[in-house]
């Protein structure tokens, strides 16, 4: 019996020693870290160090599935990193809550003529498209003896791309309060692809050139149409240039690379300017093997895939755009960055007009256009239909402001929906040649503004607001781009260039006002009802 009691005592002592060691080496250090905030892990949301940009990006990507980022809605509150109490709301949140972004647009949306699509007609059209897809897919599988357990596609009217199309109206491609846009961005980022193909333009041009006559054989036009599992589709532009690279000085604008990150950033800037004329665009890491090669039915596209010496999967475009494998794009080994821009409604449903830009550049190695030589060129334009009897010229100037901010010299045409007539807005498509050189401000892009000395009051008020410290353009762009999966989308020099170029625009307007007077320069256009006093800016400052 004494021996048994001794064994029990030894066991209790051993357990006590183990518990003490665990308390000292594991529990006590955690208690100490909780008591000393400066020593908390870096990932803690209330620690002395802010989470990294990549964590912000990942969180934004996760939250898109459940949160609707309507532009006037509240963004998540951000805890102060050291004091532990709520910090002031973000600049992006404050911007979209400003009265300029709340005022009702004029004229109000009243009837069917204000919406691009007739909903019932559009839904019938899309149902037929899905049924035709299912028939063709079945024939394709039978032709090649393919077995697939995938059920036929079902058309869903609530799909985000359908709601985006039905929401296009006479004010813009989407409303400020649209809930479908956040869902569409999320779906394009995450939905699996079911097909990949060349665009219709590229199909029409395949083989219709002599590769030896190409000025610079490069992948500037390498792009694909991807269709997703919800039957939505987007234009995919792969990464051709690293973010840190600038366009060389001796490159002509018409042979510059098309940059995927420029397409993404252009959508965010367009939204911040409250134009809403750029189709929703996101970045995505695409598996070129699983999401392009294995789902395409185009034999030409299949034939241009190869494995590089570094064991990366690559593909290139056929003539006329480039003719050699050294101009291919490659995954790493399968994953490739790219931009995805949502398609607009079919031309069968919503015809568009493509119009040459009056300030088009000379697409030759020498020579200049009239506007580059004649400072009074705008007087001539004002005498020509439709610039003599509509707000079209103000739309051209809006587009010039947008292009100057992103540094896009390649706006040779613009498109409009024919339904909205001469006063309809210009759609800002194909922005991939923007953000090429942050160190140079191409003043010639502002020629429509400088020569015509006109600008919409609404546009000017937004520009002046974005020049204020509380709503600084570079800051709200930086914050907005954190939502994207490929963040950081722009390098810091490109963001700072936006502020510099904004000041140049405002100085140009100021010079116009000094020369011609405010009444001749500031145009009401088809902007909006009068904003509250808090939203008015000093037009001469």
From Swiss-Prot:
* Family note: Belongs to the FAM20 family.
Signal peptide from the UniProt entry: 1-33
- GO MF, any single term: protein serine/threonine kinase activator activity
Kindly provide the PTM information from the record: N-glycosylated.
Q: One Gene Ontology cellular component annotation?
A: cytoplasm
Quote the protein name from its UniProt record: Pseudokinase FAM20A
Q: Which GO terms describe its biological process?
A: biomineral tissue development; calcium ion homeostasis; enamel mineralization; positive regulation of protein phosphorylation; response to bacterium; tooth eruption
Q: How does it assemble?
A: Interacts with FAM20C; probably forming a heterotetramer of 2 subunits of FAM20A and 2 subunits of FAM20C.
Induction of its expression: By all-trans retinoic acid (atRA) and IL3 in EML cell line.
What is the documented disruption phenotype for this protein? Mice survive to adulthood and show biomineralization defects such as severe amelogenesis imperfecta (AI). In addition, mice develop disseminated calcifications of muscular arteries and intrapulmonary calcifications, similar to those of fetuin-A (Ahsg) deficient mice, although they are normocalcemic and normophosphatemic, with normal dentin and bone.
Sugar attachment sites: 70, 145, 287, 388, 538
Q: Where in the cell is it found?
A: Secreted; Golgi apparatus; Endoplasmic reticulum
For this UniProt record, give its keywords in alphabetical order, as a comma-separated list: Biomineralization, Disulfide bond, Endoplasmic reticulum, Glycoprotein, Golgi apparatus, Secreted, Signal
> Which InterPro entries does its entry note?
FAM20, FAM20_C
- Record function comment: Pseudokinase that acts as an allosteric activator of the Golgi serine/threonine protein kinase FAM20C and is involved in biomineralization of teeth. Forms a complex with FAM20C and increases the ability of FAM20C to phosphorylate the proteins that form the 'matrix' that guides the deposition of the enamel minerals.
Which domain of life, per UniProt?
Eukaryota
On tissue specificity, the annotation reads: In the mammary gland, expressed at higher levels in lactating mice than in virgin mice. Observed throughout the tissues of the mandibular incisor, including the secretory and maturation stage ameloblasts, the suprabasal layers of the gingival epithelium and the odontoblasts. Weak expression in the enamel matrix.
* Xref: Pfam families: Fam20C
